[in-house]
Amino acid sequence: MTQEKGKFAEQLALNYLKENGLALVMQNYHCRLGEIDLIMREGSYLVFVEVRSRSNMNFGGGLASITYEKKQKIIKATSHYMIKYRIQDKFPIRFDVISIDGKSNKITWLKNAFDAGC
């Protein structure tokens, strides 16, 4: 996915999540361990969101495109974020995936798509 398409997909996802009652905490959190596209708040939960845009759905949707290694990077970046901001054990967390069909811009929201145990 090109950087321009990625930013467009993230903005679509962000707007969709806000329309569904989530609040933005941070966008594009980067650390040496990995990155997190969106960090949102839903009730008491901190929700760490991976955004995937697929122009060809023949090989599965967004979740199918997230490898074990990518999940590990997201989990490590989440730990880094929680420690950096001293909020570990203060909020329950969840890992969601927003999958966007690159042709139609149809959004699929997979709540609790994976956990820290992968």
Swiss-Prot record:
Cysteine pairings via disulfide bonds: none
SUPFAM superfamilies referenced in this protein's UniProt entry, alphabetically: Restriction endonuclease-like (SSF52980)
InterPro entries: Restrct_endonuc-II-like, tRNA_endonuc-like_dom_sf, UPF0102_YraN-like
Pfam family, one: UPF0102
Origin superkingdom: Bacteria
GO molecular function: nucleic acid binding
Family: Belongs to the UPF0102 family.
NCBIfam families attached to this UniProt entry: PRK12497.1-3, YraN family protein
Protein name: UPF0102 protein lpg2994
